[in-house]
A protein has these predicted regions:
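N-terminal beta1-alpha1 cap of cysteine-dependent amidohydrolase-like domains
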Residues: 1-258
Length: 258
């Protein structure tokens, strides 16, 4: 990047190291900001002992990572793979994916969703949540702006001021009691203002606690995870799990009888 030109030496050296341990690549995919010119492709092909047509440039995309499959198809990477494996495979229909990317790049309107959590400062802490919101937004021709709200800040301040005017509030899963009261206040703010609310795992639990306290008048209602002595345990462990000391790997996944 500093020299303003593509350097092929790192690729050649990486492939040489692979060949030293007996791995000969059939295809070399080069991550690059720009396309590879034919001279660089031929140089990589020659020094890596890979066919010229099997040198693929994986360029930076303009808008979203979801453009990558379409760019790779444009470079015929799918055909290279099936040809090298000797598989007779029909050309896939990517029209649904193309439509999704088009909606993602050219939204018709915008929405703001507040995500209230205690790991907001960590970029990837709620990565799957953020990506799910982006995908859901594209399905509805919407660009989703995410307002990251620290639940502990709500405890020390005012929910209406901190959360503000948003189109929806989402509280993701989590464990422990740190920041829990801020999440309960966020759920209350959503209920009293009519803002759409989605609670996932712990987010559903805090909505239950909030409703129990402020609508059902169950003072001190809580989950037994956060307050074992709560007078109103509206969320509790299953009877068969109450004796478990190590809570790791006890989360129920998938369908099961209840």
């Amino acid at each position: 990047r500093a020299a303003g030109e593509i350097k092929t030496k790192p690729t050649q050296q990486s492939v040489a190291k692979l060949r030293e341990i007996g791995i000969q690549p059939d295809i070399v995919i080069c991550r690059t900001e720009h396309d590879l010119d034919d001279d660089n492709r031929r140089k990589i092909a020659m020094f890596c002992n890979v066919e010229h047509r099997n040198i693929v440039a994986f360029r930076d995309v303009k808008h979203s990572i979801y453009e990558c499959p379409l760019d790779l198809r444009q470079d015929k990477i799918d055909r290279l793979v099936v040809d090298n494996l000797g598989i007779d495979s029909p050309t896939p229909d990517l029209s649904d994916w193309e439509n999704f990317v088009e909606r993602l790049i050219n939204p018709q309107h915008k929405v703001t969703i507040a995500v209230v959590g205690k790991y907001i400062e960590l970029q990837d802490a709620y990565k799957s949540i953020y990506e799910s919101l982006t995908i859901a937004g594209a399905a509805h021709h919407a660009e989703v702006t995410i307002a990251r709200i620290d639940s502990e800040a709500i405890e020390a301040g005012d929910a209406s001021t901190i959360i503000g005017d948003v189109d929806g509030i989402l509280i993701p899963g989590g464990f422990g009691d740190r920041g829990i009261e801020g999440k309960i206040l966020a759920a209350q703010y959503a209920r009293t203002t009519g803002i759409p609310y989605l609670g996932i795992c712990l987010g559903m639990q805090v909505a239950t606690v909030e409703f129990a306290r402020n609508v059902c008048n169950l003072e001190g209602a809580h989950t037994t995870e956060c307050n074992k002595k709560t007078p109103h345990p509206v969320i509790s462990l299953q009877e068969e799990q109450k004796g478990i000391k190590d809570m790791g790997a006890t989360m129920r996944l998938g369908s099961c009888d209840s």
